[in-house]
Amino acid sequence: MKPRPYSVFLFLHIVFYSLLSAVNGSPSLDYFETCSNFVPRAGIPTFSPYAVIKNFDEVNRMYYIQVVGNLSGVITIVGGNGSHIHAASVYSETYALGKLVTSNTTKLCDVVMDPHSFEVPIKCPWAAGSAAFMVKVPFKSTLSDYSKYELTTLTTRVIVVDGTPEKNVITCMKFGLSTTLYYFYPVISYLVVVSLAYVSFSIIYALFLNPWTGSLDPFKSIFNFNMDPDALRLTSLGFFDFVQYLQFAVSTAQVSVMFPKFYINIMAALSWGTALFRFPIFSEPAEYQFADFADLSVASSSYADYLPKSYGMYSFLDSIGIGTACWLPFLIVMVIYLFAALFVALLVIFLKWLMSRIFNETIAETRWDTWSFIAGSLIRLYFLTYFPTVAYMSFQFVAPPTGYEIIPVLWFIFFGIFIPVYLYMNLAFVEPSSKLLEDQTYLHLFGSIYNSFREERVMFWIFPIAVQFMRGITVGVIGSSGSAQLAIFFILEVANVVAYAYVRPHFPQTSMNTLNTFISTMRLITVILMIPLDPRLKVLGISRDLLAYAILFIHIMVCILFLLLSTQRFMEVSARLLGAKSESKGVPLDRPFGWARVFGINELRRRRLKDPYSNGNTMMFDHSTYNSNEMSVPLTPVSVCSNSLKKDGEAAPPKLFVQTNCIPPVTQASSLVPSKNNTASSSSLMLDSPVTPSSPYSTSQGYSFYRPPKPKSSVRKRDMDQLRALQLDFLNNKPNLLRHDVNYAVREADVYHPHVDTSIDSLSQISSQPFEMRPTAIPPPPKNAFQRAWQIVQSTAKSIWHSDPPKESEKGFVVLRSRPRPNLQKPLPQLHIEPSRDEQYSMERKKTDDSLAESAWSIPHP
């Protein structure tokens, strides 16, 4: 039997209705106390309340409060007809943030009822202390009239006076009332869902289109095979970080502290972030009683004894509209999320196949790669829902039993403890560890766990998992003590700040360490603001509401930060695809907050082609002898050498006189062989003019140019062991529609460091000269504090007694280019070889024979 199309739409309608529909419950009581300025007077009867019961009429949307208490003495009741009638009365006033909202006056005899018979009125007069009675306080406004007060606490004050002309006060009590989110519930839910979708689309946009690791292959784009810091910078504070912060915000409402009910209602509207919302078949009206016949008049009893079921997880589940057995709707929502994750994984695989067809690219894939990618997507979902799994399943250990408790226990043991231990055993003993970053099998399955950490910090993923586990146990099991929960939350956030600030598991170029430290600091401030809400401190009234507003303000600021980073992500990737680049003038691509690097005024100036004659130092040259089409963009010279004449009297091209530390003058006519003329006192280098080097405007042979110095603050060191893939292949090799004028294959070494051609052997000859300053051996770093202190003392003494003369500061560096080497014929030196002893004897004998022969020829013959 085929599923009909309308059944699918009906299922989606039920899911979204459950996600975004408001809870149809009654208002909730926040606190109940006696007025601080009420002092019982002698001789006047008093009414001592000991319980509060709230009631709500679903038909006419009216609600009222029943206060149960004991009466001491006889209340004077004056009745009869006439214009001057005095009777015992009940005054009720409702305030919102100190402003009067409504007031009502009712005769006491009209609202007094028997607490044991319920809704049975007591006739006036009645005997003192004969029975307790209830005072019914009605509100003559419907619930819709209070919709604008859904995000605040309605403080109600009830005053009972007798029927005497003096109107003696019998009792005075205050309690807080919070209405359910009826109108603001969909607004908050839709707003957060749209924000999360916006962050998600920005991450997808950056993963596939960034100029470093962007690729048609979604496996490589999503799991970031190259571990490129620039790509990680664009994806920092993404979808997972946003969801985890929402889970933290929801967990604050699950702590047993005296939060106002409206704060818990707001966090309940975000409960879908913890895989729990009001599913229709498990929903029930929020009819939780604040205190049902709690004897507050007994001295041994205290207000804090009744808090565990008034705040924390109980109140949070009450705001959602489900019972304490929350594990069953949680598992149903998890099944829905599981199918959603499978659908997204299959959609990614389909897009991979579709893009390969469109661009005619052959993407090598195997069946194992596909299955491992699907399994890796499920692991992502598992870690995304790890905190609610631990929190809701562990809560069943202390919740009232409802049957089938073995299911949440087994779920907690398997998914809360066994799976993390199994993953640790699989990843901790992989040899070599680089296999985790190079093997596609590990990256497909487990890459989402550690692919944002550095290689030496790849096992740092254990720390956030341990923090999530401890936070879940805290809100699930330790609900009876709000102080203990606050202490554990404080320790966890301090550990987070120290871990990200000291261990620094992410690449420095990504700014993820700084951003995670900032988020942890915001969470720590939130926990500190929760401390005054401890039940033992009894902070009530407006002060408690202001603390809740401050915490909500922090949550809003963090959400705005996520939206700003997503906007910057969209704009930076779009600008780079359109041709913007920040590599010119040595500005690195890995700078944080690349928005200004793309659209800043300095970057816009660098993109303009400068006039070759705009430089004042080059305008002193004779322009008439040069062709403007053959001129290159001049760089900043130091000075111009004058009186440069050729042998025939013509003016020679101007020369640059560049100061150096240890390189002697080098010209075409000068010999590179050490001689007496090239002395160590030479400290300058004669180079050709910056107008002559080759450039896009000229094809002439260029020799050298001078690059001005850069401020040290604008250069950010990179990790030397990280390679960069700066070319977006599928955009550069595709039709003109996707092509852009950006060369991402420029090496960083060509930007920052002087380029020296290997064909120039003059540097090797210069290095052989005796006057070159060679680098001295660097002593090994000291091992302990004593050696460091001794090294400081030695360096200080050496600088005092052997102070060197001040040297001229370095003015930049010279980039040498290849030039035709002059063919210099060097005369070969005459070799003088000492003869051996036999050779000397033969040579002397030969000389003797020659002399005898000459003397013989010189004797005259007879």
From Swiss-Prot:
The UniProt record lists the keyword Transmembrane helix: yes
Its transmembrane ranges are 62-82, 188-208, 231-250, 257-277, 330-350, 373-393, 405-425, 458-480, 484-503, 515-535, 546-566
- In terms of one coarse class, where is the protein primarily found? cytoplasm
Q: Does the keyword Transmembrane apply?
A: yes
Which residue intervals make up region (Disordered)?
668-717, 815-862
| Gene Ontology MF terms | calcium channel activity
List the ranges whose topology is Cytoplasmic: 83-187, 251-256, 351-372, 426-457, 504-514, 567-862
The Gene Ontology CC terms held by the record are: cytoplasm; Golgi apparatus; Golgi membrane; membrane; plasma membrane
* Compositionally biased tracts (Basic and acidic residues): 834-850
* Source organism superkingdom: Eukaryota
Q: Which residues lie on this side of the membrane: Lumenal?
A: 26-61, 209-230, 278-329, 394-404, 481-483, 536-545
Q: Which family does it belong to?
A: Belongs to the transient receptor potential (TRP) ion channel family.
Report what the protein is called.
Uncharacterized membrane protein C1322.03
